[in-house]
């Protein structure tokens, strides 16, 4: 209305009508639109369904922080950080070097306060942030900086789940085996796994599903042996539990982190990047070092 007002008086009249609440920023609700439940409530239900304990979640969360703190000390992230404007940023301050299983165990459940297992400590914190990646063909990549880490996008897969039957954040557990089966690969053929850690429970439930033959056969419709899942190859430089979850930018953050790690590995090394999303969606990509 102000832009269409004619004359200074008309503009001033419009500005005087602005109330304080009109300037208040809307805080996005982390809720599933189709159910009204928060993602944490959905993760609680899935953790109960798969029998993932509070202790398992806290152990995983502490490991995510340890990995991120080590990677920060080794300056792994330095090439991935861009300072905003006049404020220099050369390290991520979110990973905690004092995080322990004992400290995490003292935190109270956040979504089911009586019987829940998901706490602020084993959930990813929502953060302010942005991330970007370049996608180029063989010719276009020569226009990028020579020291930029580059990987090859080999294939990708998307999946969706029945939220009530399988759990809101479980679609990657369908997409991953389908992608691997199509490429005639097993779990051991993947040298690096970058899995979005929305919640420690969600990662652990996904891994359990990937190790469950009935899930693979009946839900993913994959009737082949993929082998034991290599948990030690998951998020070696920390994940969203330690680094945070900038809504809308996490996928690019994980892709850039995967590319930076793959760039240090031999040519032909493979990485699976996995991200769960609202609506029961899952997005998975297969990358390869060049």
Show where each model-derived region lies.
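Short, well-ordered beta-strand elements within core beta-sheets of diverse protein domains
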Residues: 43-53, 133, 177-185
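Active-site-proximal alpha-helical scaffold in enzymes
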Residues: 47-76, 132-140, 207, 246-267, ...
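N-terminal extracellular/periplasmic Venus flytrap/periplasmic-binding protein-like
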Residues: 19, 56-143, 215-216, 220-233
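Condensing-enzyme catalytic core mediating Claisen C-C bond formation in acyl metabolism
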Residues: 14-28, 102-174, 178, 182-183, ...
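Active-site pocket-lining segment
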Residues: 162-242
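Flexible glycine-/small-residue-enriched beta->alpha junction loops
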Residues: 1-45
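Conserved beta-ketoacyl condensing-enzyme motif
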Residues: 1-3, 75, 80-91, 188-210
């Amino acid at each position: 209305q102000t832009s269409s007002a004619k004359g200074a008086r008309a503009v001033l009249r419009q500005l005087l009508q602005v109330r304080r609440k009109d300037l208040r920023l809307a805080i996005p609700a982390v809720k599933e639109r189709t159910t009204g439940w928060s993602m944490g409530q959905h993760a609680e239900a899935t953790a109960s369904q798969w029998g993932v304990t509070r202790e398992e979640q806290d152990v995983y969360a502490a490991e995510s922080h340890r990995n991120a703190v080590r990677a920060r000390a080794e300056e792994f992230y330095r090439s991935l950080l861009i300072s905003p404007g006049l404020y220099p940023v050369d390290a991520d301050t979110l990973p905690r070097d004092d995080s322990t299983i004992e400290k995490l165990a003292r935190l109270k459940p956040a979504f089911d306060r009586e019987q829940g297992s998901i706490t602020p400590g084993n959930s990813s914190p929502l953060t302010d942030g942005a991330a970007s990646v370049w996608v180029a063909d063989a010719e276009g990549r020569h226009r990028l900086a020579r020291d930029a880490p580059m990987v090859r996008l080999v294939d990708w897969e998307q999946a969706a789940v029945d939220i009530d039957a399988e759990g809101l954040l479980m679609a990657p557990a369908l997409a991953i085996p389908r992608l691997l089966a199509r490429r005639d690969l097993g779990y051991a053929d993947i040298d690096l796994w970058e899995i979005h850690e929305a919640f420690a429970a969600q990662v652990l439930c996904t891994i359990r599903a990937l190790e469950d033959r009935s899930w693979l056969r009946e839900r993913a419709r994959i009737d082949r042996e993929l082998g034991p899942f290599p948990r030690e190859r998951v998020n070696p430089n920390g994940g969203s539990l330690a680094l945070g979850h900038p809504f809308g930018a996490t996928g690019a953050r994980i892709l850039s982190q995967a590319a930076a790690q793959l760039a240090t590995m031999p040519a032909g090394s493979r990485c699976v990047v996995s991200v769960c999303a609202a609506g029961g969606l899952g997005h998975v990509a297969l990358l390869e070092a060049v």
